[in-house]
A protein has these predicted regions:
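Phosphate/NTP-binding elements of NTP-utilizing enzymes
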Residues: 1-204
Length: 204
């Protein structure tokens, strides 16, 4: 497990990727670019089907987008989450946006009249409240998982840490999956810090 706290304006994710940790915790101010860096990397790998650093071919090139509540993974909200991404640059002009349809995430493009065409599937959404539902499903192409705003001031789920670990186990199926847990605030009341005995984080 790697914990990365940065105070500079923008995150450089390449150093984090070299650690090859399963769980990566990114903490910092809301505007310092940690979400941007993770989203850019995951979208790049999803399109190119290659490792972001080594450019080696990846079979698990898709990503999972995790939130606590099902209401947070509605299609409109997921699309808005990726609105700040330079999709045209990442996809070399093939697509211009990201959309979510029935829980799956796709690249998409628009013609001159604004008509939308859904492209290839690049990911899937997950709610921690529905981990039991996912257990019977297969996610063999997902290699990255984004858990946005894992620190909250509005309350955690009962057994939330177990739910997350169960979900990751369902996705990974004995293979390596990289999880990026992004937190915008530091709260001493965080079950992840307690469960994983991250005492030094709580004191900072």
């Amino acid at each position: 497990m790697i914990i990365l706290k940065q105070k500079q304006k923008y995150y450089n994710i390449e150093n984090l990727l070299t650690k090859k940790a399963e769980y990566n915790i990114l903490l910092g101010e809301r505007s310092n670019g940690k979400s941007y860096a993770v989203k850019y990397m995951t979208l790049w790998e999803a399109y190119h089907k290659e490792d972001y650093l080594t450019h080696e071919e990846k079979t698990r090139y898709m990503f999972g987008y995790v939130r606590r509540w099902r209401e947070e993974i509605k299609g409109r909200d997921v699309a808005q989450y990726f609105e700040d991404m330079p999709i045209s640059k990442i996809t070399e002009g093939e697509y211009d946006s990201v959309i979510c349809y029935r829980g799956d995430i796709y690249f998409s493009s628009h013609d001159e009249e604004g008509n939308e065409t859904r492209g290839e599937k690049i990911g899937a959404t997950f709610a921690l409240t529905g981990v039991t539902h996912y257990k019977s499903l297969s996610f063999t192409k997902i290699g990255n998982v984004i858990f946005e705003e894992f620190i909250t001031n509005t309350g955690y789920l009962s057994h939330e840490v177990d739910n997350l670990q169960s979900l990751i186990s369902t996705i990974a199926r004995r293979e390596r999956v990289a999880v990026y847990m992004i937190g915008n605030t530091i709260s001493r009341l965080c079950p992840y810090f307690d469960e994983w005995q991250l005492v030094h984080v709580k004191k900072q």
